[in-house]
Regions:
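Soluble "head" domains of membrane/secretory-pathway proteins
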Residues: 2-6, 10, 16-17, 21, ...
Length: 135
């Protein structure tokens, strides 16, 4: 009886341990909250976030990423538009990278409010420029 209980407890601890390792280092489920990535992602869509790929390669333009915001347990889902070292600017509703208009096949709408990006922004070595698809 005692041996059976110890065995059950061992497997319970093992399952929780493996689950913790997987969600911490490999992948994690998240839910889309809002329309900022519409039409690509919809409100309440469920996603699996890959936590491994960027350990082996750098993020690329047009990748969709999940990143933490300033507050604990708050994350954004956006698309990478500008890469480290590039200069990004939004003119007349379109994104320009290093002075060349960016071809965005996933987004046909013009950007209504360029905000700070109406002036050129040169990205640092570890900076990315991200936007939602719903502009």
């Amino acid at each position: 009886m005692k041996k059976g209980l110890i065995e059950v407890l061992f497997y319970i601890v093992l399952v929780f341990g493996v689950s913790f390792l997987l969600t911490t280092y490999v992948g994690q489920r998240t839910r889309v909250n809002g329309e900022s990535m519409y039409p690509t992602l919809h409100d309440d869509d469920n996603l699996i976030v890959d936590k491994v790929s960027y350990r082996f390669s750098d993020p690329r333009r047009y990748d969709i990423i999940v990143f933490p915001y300033r507050y604990k347990d708050m994350y954004f889902i956006k698309r990478i538009i500008g890469l480290p070292g590039e200069t990004v600017q939004i003119l007349d509703g379109y994104v320009y990278i290093d002075g060349k208009k960016l071809d965005e096949h996933f987004c046909d709408e013009k950007i209504q409010n360029a905000a700070l990006a109406s002036d050129p922004i040169t990205l640092g070595d570890d900076e990315y420029f991200v936007l939602g698809d719903n502009r």
